[in-house]
A protein has these predicted regions:
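Contiguous mid-protein beta-loop-alpha structural module that forms a pocket-lining wall or clamp
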Residues: 10, 80, 108
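Bulky hydrophobic/aromatic packing residues
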Residues: 107, 117, 129, 153-154
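Short beta-strand micro-motifs enriched in acidic
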Residues: 6-10, 20, 96-100
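Conserved metal-phosphate-binding beta-hairpin within the catalytic cores
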Residues: 83-117
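ATP-dependent carboxylate/phosphate-activation module, predominantly the ATP-grasp catalytic core
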Residues: 9-77, 86, 114-142
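Peripheral (often C-terminal) accessory segments that flank ATP-dependent C-N-forming ligase machineries
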Residues: 132-194
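Extended catalytic-interface subdomain
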Residues: 1-5
Length: 194
C-alpha cells in the first residue's frame, strides 16, 4: 500500500460509546478531511444518505453501501469485544478506503482503534449542535482563508460559526474551529485549500 493512494480517498471513523454491559451505541460516522500533506483539517458527518454519492474532496469516488455496511459491522464487533473485555467509554474505529494498484477502491475496515474522544467525535458534536443543513462540516480553518474571503465568521453566524477564539493569550491563532454550514463554502474550501 502506498500512502499516496490514500491521500485523496476518504478515511472515516465511527464514534461509539461502549457501556458497562458490553453493549455499544453508535454515535455517528464522519469523513475525515486532510490537506495535501495528510494533515487533519476537519470532519463531515456521513450516514447511509452519503452512500452512492461522491464524497467531498474525492472526485469520482462514491462510498458503496456495501462498504459502509462492512465498516459498521466490523466496528461494532471491535467495540462489542472491547466492552466484553471490560472497557467502557468513548471509542473510535477508523476505516480507510484506498486505491489499489489498478485504481479500484479497496477497503481497510479497521485502520485505527482509539479508546478516547477524537477530533471526529468533537466535530460530530459541533455539527449536531450548530449545523442546520443536511451536510455541515467542522473544520480547523486557517484564519487567512476566512479573511481572504471577507467572511463574517462569528459565534453567532449560522452559516460560518466559530467554535474557538481568534486570539489566545492576546496572540492571534493560525486556525480556528469552524462549523461551516453552506455546501458552496465547503466546496470553495476544498477546491482552493485542500
Amino acid at each position: 500500500l502506498s500512502s499516496h493512494w490514500c491521500l485523496s480517498i476518504p478515511k472515516s471513523g465511527r464514534r461509539i460509546e461502549t457501556g458497562r454491559l458490553a453493549e455499544s451505541e453508535l454515535i455517528g460516522t464522519t469523513q475525515l478531511l486532510v490537506d495535501q500533506s495528510g494533515q487533519y483539517v476537519g470532519s463531515i458527518p456521513i450516514d447511509y444518505a452519503a452512500t452512492g454519492k461522491p464524497l467531498f474532496g474525492c472526485p469520482g469516488f462514491c462510498l458503496a453501501s456495501e462498504m459502509f455496511e462492512q465498516i459498521l459491522r466490523d466496528a461494532r464487533q471491535v467495540t462489542d469485544d472491547a466492552g466484553i473485555l471490560g472497557y467502557h467509554g468513548p471509542i473510535s474505529v477508523d476505516s480507510m478506503v484506498y486505491r489499489g494498484p489498478d485504481g479500484e477502491p479497496l477497503l481497510r475496515s479497521i485502520q485505527d482503534v482509539n479508546a478516547r474522544l477524537t477530533m471526529g467525535r468533537i466535530a460530530l458534536e459541533w455539527c449536531r449542535r450548530f449545523g442546520t443543513s443536511n451536510r455541515p462540516a467542522w473544520l480547523l480553518a486557517p484564519i487567512k482563508w476566512l479573511d481572504d474571503r471577507g467572511w463574517d465568521a462569528t459565534p453567532d453566524n449560522p452559516l460560518r460559526r466559530l467554535t474557538s477564539p481568534r486570539t489566545v493569550a492576546q496572540r492571534d491563532v493560525k486556525r480556528v474551529g469552524l462549523v461551516l454550514d453552506d455546501p458552496a463554502d465547503l466546496q470553495d474550501l476544498l477546491s482552493t485549500y485542500l
